[in-house]
Regions:
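Short, flexible helix-loop junctions that flank or precede catalytic/ligand sites
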Residues: 1-358
Length: 358
């Protein structure tokens, strides 16, 4: 496959609202649209096609070895006037395969993502830890980018991001933004995060809390007066707290819970759901903000499970919300269908019963 043909494929994919493009030998390209993976009506790709795509993408990356030595590699790829793409190149059945995720040129706003005002207010925090959680492909990177944009447009600060790879490209507005990528700019999240503390940041974005060392340094950064933004692969606030605590030895758990209680300012847990129109996906989110009660739930491991109920009862007071509350709102406003809302709810039968009483 020639590079021009590949770029045309990417342009068509973006035009059709594709989130991911899959390429492998022996099958036609496939596009993930509204969460469904759909084959393109073209002939199956040959091994030389996927090899050619891997080759010209790698020529613009930091890969310096022989193509034949590559087994797995993360990089990015850009097409002018089309967009940027996060790219994973790998082998399957001895041949090259690729998955590319579309990253729009334009950085989203909190409003454009359909998130409530409380998310925008999180950008006003001067210190602490804010976490975006959800499964792969739940829109965490977009929400992080929207929060960074909000800070950038309203605050004179130094925002330092550590990403693998860099996704959204930010331009300096009121803030000064430094974007570092694992590989060409630094060797790991933990190394870059440790160095960041000597680079006079006000806000630090860490692409992912991958290991205990990164979590520890992020907590220290929050404790020393920085606002730290990051992601965790968990599905709600309670599970996020447990995941962070369990990353440490058992004897450290009580101390970590107290540190999280003092420094964890917010958790946004997301899912992407197909819209009722069949075009695009909507964000459904559980949102936790720090309160005295939340601090107690974090410290007491036997009460952490109470967080979800607390969030649903204090929406009008603190702007918090449970998943089911947001799902109900999305259904009533016609954004998603009842079947989609029920399937995504904590308990489908309870969810439908609750709707009947409203």
């Amino acid at each position: 496959m020639e590079q021009r043909t590949f770029n045309q494929l990417l342009a068509a994919a973006v035009k059709n609202g594709t989130s991911d493009l899959h390429l492998k030998a022996g099958a036609p390209p496939a596009l993930r649209i509204n969460g469904a993976l759909l084959p393109v009506k073209v002939p199956a790709l040959m091994p030389e096609d996927t090899r050619a795509v891997a080759d010209f993408i790698l020529k613009g990356s930091r890969w310096k070895g022989s193509l034949d030595d590559l087994r797995d590699w993360d990089t990015s790829y850009a097409v002018e006037d089309v967009g940027r793409f996060r790219c994973n190149i790998f082998r399957q059945k001895g041949n090259f395969a690729l998955v590319l995720r579309a990253i729009p040129f334009n950085v989203p706003t909190v409003e454009s993502l359909g998130l409530p005002p409380v998310v925008k207010s999180m950008a006003e925090y001067e210190r602490g830890l804010i976490l975006l959680t959800g499964v792969t492909g739940s829109g965490k990177s977009s929400t992080l980018a929207a929060i960074v944009r909000q800070i950038n447009e309203t605050t004179r600060a130094h925002i330092l991001t550590i990403e693998d790879p860099i996704e959204f490209l930010h331009e300096d507005k009121l803030s000064r933004i430094t974007q570092r990528e694992i590989g060409p700019d630094t060797v790991s999240f933990s190394t870059a995060l440790r160095a960041a503390l000597r680079q006079d940041p006000d806000v630090i974005l860490v692409g992912e809390m991958r290991d205990t060392e990164t979590i520890e340094i992020a907590l220290k950064a929050a404790e020393t007066g920085h606002l730290v933004l990051s992601t965790v692969h968990t599905t709600d606030a309670a599970k996020t707290i447990s995941r962070l605590v369990d990353a440490f030895p058992a004897e450290a758990h009580d101390g970590v819970r107290h540190r999280l209680a003092e420094n964890l300012k917010g958790v946004i847990s997301q899912r992407l759901l197909p819209k009722a129109t069949g075009k695009g996906r909507a964000v459904a989110a559980e949102i936790m903000v720090s309160t005295e009660s939340i601090k107690e739930f974090i410290i007491d491991k036997d009460r952490t499970h109470e967080i979800a109920e607390y969030l649903s009862k204090n929406r009008d007071v603190y702007g918090t919300q449970s998943f089911d509350q947001h799902l109900s709102e999305l259904y009533k406003s016609g954004v998603v269908t009842l079947d989609v809302a029920k399937a995504a709810s904590t308990n489908p039968s309870d969810f439908e019963r609750a709707l009947s009483f409203e």
